[in-house]
């Protein structure tokens, strides 16, 4: 079994971790030259701001909707990614970075001790506790299916951020 952990709205969430006053506020992060939107908090997504949208199209909306805007801070994002990796590595036998905000976790053999779904929820809780970041986790027999299951965590909130494609969940 494999899990794919993906931090939710990673760049925007990193900005919020160190600014508690931004909780539940719309946040966007701009590209290197501040030319376009590269990250959005859920609140900013709800306002209709699109990924890749040019800054000049959002500038006026920033004032009207009280959107908090940040230039990208890659040192912060790298540091937070390393923190998440450290948490996952402390609880998992093998972790493989997939991108700055996604990691594959090798869960082979874990089902002999604990259900993969329960373990996924434990990982989510620990990452949230130690870093302040939330993540979705897809769990499946292959990495490709784990990636698909992770996508499903964003579509099906009733699974509380963990979708496990296991035999036990086949009819769920």
List the model feature ranges, each with a label:
Residues 1-172:
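Nucleic-acid-contacting surfaces of polymerase cores and analogous helical-repeat interfaces
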